[in-house]
Amino acid sequence: MNLRQVEAFRAVMLTGQMTAAAELMLVTQPAISRLIKDFEQATKLQLFERRGNHIIPTQEAKTLWKEVDRAFVGLNHIGNLAADIGRQAAGTLRIAAMPALANGLLPRFLAQFIRDRPNLQVSLMGLPSSMVMEAVASGRADIGYADGPQERQGFLIETRSLPAVVAVPMGHRLAGLDRVTPQDLAGERIIKQETGTLFAMRVEVAIGGIQRRPSIEVSLSHTALSLVREGAGIAIIDPAAAIEFTDRIVLRPFSIFIDAGFLEVRSAIGAPSTIVDRFTTEFWRFHDDLMKQNGLME
């Protein structure tokens, strides 16, 4: 038994005629007849009764047809899936990201990315940067977005260097400034990132000598921005998180450069993935365009 014989059987069952089946398969009628005869010999079943110019499927043929049709539906599904994979519309994509991105830019971009990819299975994990690196290293994530040093063994890394911005409540005295200096923060309550993070250390180096009111310490950028929105204080923040709040707070450049960029992390081990390549390329384009539109990146 071979696939061509099964295809001939399916064509005859679909059309009900040898001639029509031959046209469907783009072969001659004698060729179809030979394939059906060989298929009957291979299965040791009489599949059709010949009555003049007509052929009538036997009960055995009808029973076999159910399985053959189911198999061809499966083959068609495989073909469609292969086509989807070829145009990056199917497969799996596992993303681990620090909360500043997992709660903001990434969901916005991801909704756009999957719109024309209905068969793409995606997982998005919001994790601390250290755990993002672990997820990529262990193979639990295909891509990671994290804060941290750029020199890391065993990873492929791409990054953007972005200046942190100052987030102030609407109507605040600093909202009228073109640029905020460390001295402008004197007497203000600063909402700062969790002590010990790389970004928090960078901020403290920049404003450490300024007299301020007691600070509020938070673990998430979005928490800091929500507090700014409610008038609780001022935050020096990464623009990737702040972009989600531009209609509710005021963002101003800071006079001292504080690197608020992030890393795109992929494992250096293993074969590249077309869908991952497409995602990362399109995400950086989306990110850069959005930052430029809002004056947060040159």
From Swiss-Prot:
Entry GO MF terms: DNA-binding transcription factor activity; sequence-specific DNA binding
Gene Ontology biological process terms, A to Z: positive regulation of gene expression
CDD domains documented for this protein: PBP2_OccR
Annotated signal peptide: none
Highest taxon listed in the record's lineage: Bacteria
SUPFAM superfamilies per UniProt: Periplasmic binding protein-like II, Winged helix' DNA-binding domain
PROSITE patterns recorded: HTH_LYSR
Keyword Glycoprotein: no
Domain HTH lysR-type intervals: 1-58
Xref: Pfam families: HTH_1, LysR_substrate
Keywords annotated in UniProt: Activator, DNA-binding, Plasmid, Transcription, Transcription regulation
DNA-binding region range list: 18-37
Function of the molecule: Positive regulatory protein for the occ operon involved in octopine catabolism and uptake. Also acts as a negative regulator of its expression.
Family label: Belongs to the LysR transcriptional regulatory family.
PANTHER family for this protein: TRANSCRIPTIONAL ACTIVATOR PROTEIN LYSR
The protein's name: Octopine catabolism/uptake operon regulatory protein OccR
